[in-house]
Amino acid sequence: MMAQKSQGSDNLQEGQEKSKREILKCTKSAWAPLDEWLPPDPEEESQSLTIPMLEDSKQESIQQWLDSGFFVSANENFQQVIDRTVSLYEQGMVQMTVKDYMRSLHQFSETPILSRGTSFNSCYSTASVPQSIPEWLEFWEIDPVEILLDLGFGADEPDICMQIPARFLGCGSAARGINIRVFLEAQKQRMDIENPNLYGRFRQLEILDHVTNAFSSLLSDVSILPNRAEEKAGGESVQRTSVSAAKEHRRRMGKLLRRASKQNIRRDCNPEVSESFKVKDEVFVPFTKPWDCGAELAATSINHKQNHLSLSVEHQSLQACDDLLPYPPHGLLSKQWPCSSMPAKQAPPSCVSEGSVKGRTQKENLFQTNKLKSLSHLAGKGPDSFEMEEVQSFEEETGNPLDMTSGTVGARVDRANSCQSDSSGFLEEPLEPLPLQMPSLPNSQSPAENGGRKPRDQSHSLVSSQDCQLESDGPDSKSRASMSFSSQEANALEQRASVSVMEEEFLLEAMEGPPELYIPDMACAKTTTRGECPRKDSHLWQLLPMPHAEYEVTRPTATSKYDHPLGFMVTHVTEMQDSFVRPEGAGKVQSHHNESQRSPGNDHTQDKFLHVDSEAPREEESSGFCPHTNHSLLVPESSSQCIPKHSEITPYATDLAQTSEKLIPHLHKLPGDPAQVKSRSGTLGQILPGTEAEMENLPLNTGSSRSVMTQMSSSLVSAAQRAVALGTGPRGTSLECTVCDPVTATETRLGTKARQLNDASIQTSALSNKTLTHGPQPLTKSVSLDSGFSSICPMGTCHAIPAHCCICCHHHPHCHGERQSPGPEPSVCRHCLCSLTGHQEAQFMTTLKALQDTTVRELCSCTVHEMEAMKTICQSFREYLEEIEQHLMGQQALFSRDMSEEEREEAEQLQTLREALRQQVAELEFQLGDRAQQIREGILLQLEVLTAEPPEHYSNLHQYNWIEESNGQTSCSKIHPGMAPRTVFPPDDGQEAPCSGGTQLAAFTPPTLENSTRMSPSSSAWAKLGPTPLSNCPVGEKDADVFL
């Protein structure tokens, strides 16, 4: 029995082994191509003959796999894969791995796949087919090693980027703004460069600390040097730090001496002129260049946006130029050109004591120390860039030390072509002075003007006099002076500011010829080529330099006064501000000479108005102009001598700056006493120390004529649009007001060309008195508004002397503190309501009424009504949309059963679009309502501010500020009650002067324009005050009060 059982078991085992052997034979035929086509054994061939042959080998293979319990996809892809694998091996490539084989079969096989690495014992037979889910999961288990290898692990790669999977590098990132490759390169570079040692980093901090200490000590030494130099009266020069510095100093000193000797030769050639250049005080050095004294600082312009130092008016003549220099006095950035005819204010109003000089010295040192802190990067090259040694060396040679009372009136710097990129810009010993060069601003190109060719004469003037004759000698008579400096602190200076000092030229074509006026064409005067945007100082055709010229120079402006021996006085004010460049295209400056010939018997003067207009873009300049106006006021003192004067104003191409000069009758003088002319200038966005040029010895029986053209800012768009309805549209409006003793007339002139340019420029006309005038003559002021406004602006009438005409614009409150002087010189802003103290309440109520009538009714209410109308339209449109939507939804509910799927989707899309449209209309409606509410609140806020302030604030003009708002809007003018259209002031003789014009010019002045006019207190009668409408004032603008 045991033998039979053992034999039965043996038979069973043999049967199982036989079946396994047969399965192996069947499966091995399938693996044969992968086993490099090994020849089969003879036994296997003989046994395979017993297997029934099928018609197709493919069906036989399927049957064999089915019998063995495996399922292979019976399609052609399997055979294609095998054939491809065979071809790869035939080409000699490496044998395929398990991973590659599984990937090649996985794309078309959905059944279990036999792996080459699995032995026959591990293969499932008919009895070991997976019967449960865990077995099938184990059968389909993926090898984790292959996954890690796919991810890039397990490979020894030197590049760290290879550890990142290929899908992150091969495919672009869906995130915006992320560049994986740039990030990886940056990280790799950082790992390569960075020093992982922390000690190295702390060492860097230590080195930086040492460098900071060194610079701090250097700055302290430099700040102490000017005090020592002043105490020693310029007796010693700065020590040379190196041999090269000494050589450079000697070279510059030689150049300076050669130039000084050349000026001495010129002075000797003109003995008549040199007689007038005598030393008035022992602290001044004789000036060797005659025409420099008359025009050295007459056209000074400075780029200065931050004014953080308030100075008193009584110290203007002593420290005005010092404010222009951020550097110590021992480095005056210039050659001290001594001038005997440019004394600091020696008149009694401006004389100060020694204590005030010491106090000014302390303030000056503190100011210079603060400036030096912002210029630490320039401390290392002071002697080279700033020519500190040159000034003191020249003082040693001439034996004239610096004087504190003289300031830096005669200081200037010779700068080379502005195309140089270094900080100093000095050339190597030029043989002769080069043409006038303009330093460039940070935001504008400034190619050299008249560069590379001989500069032509910019001014021609013929004056017949007995004691003052001059002749200039070509290019040497034109000197360049500019001071360039930079700072690192925003509160001190802007990126790059430049102070440009020009001197005017005077040419005598004939030594004893009759007086003749030569007016060149302005088109010829422009030498800028296409594509250039140079900054050009105005070329003024003025009188000869006066023997006694006094200067008042402040930080942003410079005012010069010429005291002509013949009795003429010229006030020249120059101002520049880097705040705003006109966006319009280029304009060509054209000169229009409007001459009105009047008979000598009518006691009228011959007025010539030179209008410089920015017309349409021309070929000569492609950059936009931002006018920078330099204008001068000429008032003849002697009625028996009539000298022509021509003033040409060329606007600067960089900044918007406006200066205005008005004839101001003195407040404390009788009609027969000399009058006083004040020149006030304001700059947009900064505090202006006022520049006041007083004109003494001006009789009232002389005629004067002046033309001022003002172009408004481009922010007054809404008013310009409304002006179209009045018939003016974009046409330039020019108002000419002739103020005389018996009659005040207003004449309105419309421009002949439509202009869209909204810039601001002020210019003065030429004064030409061809006849002898005795007695009061009309003072003609022409104002041109190129802003697209109508001329309906109220203005009160006034007569010549003792009228009170005050046009006061709101400005920085710092102006008043700076202009208040204890001396006899009155302040400009102190006179505003000195004669109106008894009428404050009536004026206040009239002003409030005028504000309500003009701003609320004509401007703001119209805009609010328009917004309300648009809001109503949007609301009705939204309601209409809702009705349509309800109707469509009802129709859709009825026919929804018959609609197809596409029609339903289209209906849903239309519904979404309607909802979005309704939402946008609602949002627009809300915005319109909110805007209207903001306008109402703004008007109410202005009224509350106006009513909350006491009336005495009007006398001090502290109530508002002319700081430019972010939206770029300009001022909206309020009309003082005195500015009624038919207000008439009786003259001294009691006669009542009727008004010949319906409307008068109001304060349509830009925020940078500030005009002050005084009248004599003898004006006793005031007309009835009444409100008048002021049209075309934009909403949200600042206010300007106009007092008459």
Swiss-Prot record:
Keywords of the record: Coiled coil
Organism: Homo sapiens
Extent of Acidic residues compositional bias: 388-398
Stretches with biased composition (Polar residues): 1-14, 460-469, 480-489
Tree of life domain: Eukaryota
Lineage: Eukaryota, Metazoa, Chordata, Craniata, Vertebrata
One GO MF term attached to the UniProt entry: signaling receptor binding
Protein name (record): Protein ITPRID1
Region span, Disordered: 1-20, 230-251, 388-489, 583-607
InterPro entries: ITPR-bd, SSFA2_C, TESPA1-like
Coiled coil regions in record: 896-937
